């Protein structure tokens, strides 16, 4: 992954010095030097949120960093998704603009898991365009239809670093990106055609602990919110 991004993005003349790749490695150290826009950070094994928050803290120490893209290490995306996101955020007038990438299934790459998600007043989140088949012509109108998004997953989540008001837990808690999105609900979260990531189907990760943590994630904003239940 490091070599691919370095070859196709960091060393390209039009993008050189515009991007930095921060790799937060949870657990055993990886043998890759930092330099030329690549920053390798060996971190304790604190899970996804721990890695993302460590990366966010380190990015904040770099003077010329304005935007950050969170990306899972077990997913994949086209370099074009990064380039489109960069171009869009450069033109955005609102610093609270966030770009979230559409998630598709890695074992069924034309099927959408979600293109952003929507918070309902029961405090559950509902994936937008869930199981839409991107190959079908009849699906294009639905896919192109913009909806008000309340949350974006960390498989591809780009934002202005100066617009962040709260940090997530510095250790793994399933659904941490849900809570992060709720805490920053004033953000204008948008989706873009051509910005996507392929991930493992979440149904393959179901467990008792994950189910508990998912419930906890939606229960917390329900308890602290002034909104009334339906």
Residue ranges and their predicted role:
Residues 3-18:
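Short, acidic, metal-binding catalytic loop of nucleotide-sugar glycosyltransferases
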Residues 53-67:
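Active-site nucleotide-sugar/metal-binding loop of Leloir-type enzymes
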Residues 64-76:
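Short beta-strand-to-loop acidic/aromatic patch adjacent to the donor-nucleotide binding site
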Residues 80-126:
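Conserved donor NDP-sugar-binding/catalytic core segment of glycosyltransferases
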Residues 130-156, 204-205:
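A recurrent flexible, glycine/aromatic-enriched loop bordering the glycosyltransferase active site
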Residues 149-156, 165-182, 187-195:
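Donor nucleotide-sugar recognition loop
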Residues 191-208:
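Active-site donor/metal-binding and catalytic loop motifs
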Residues 208-229:
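Catalytic core of nucleotide-sugar-dependent glycosyltransferases
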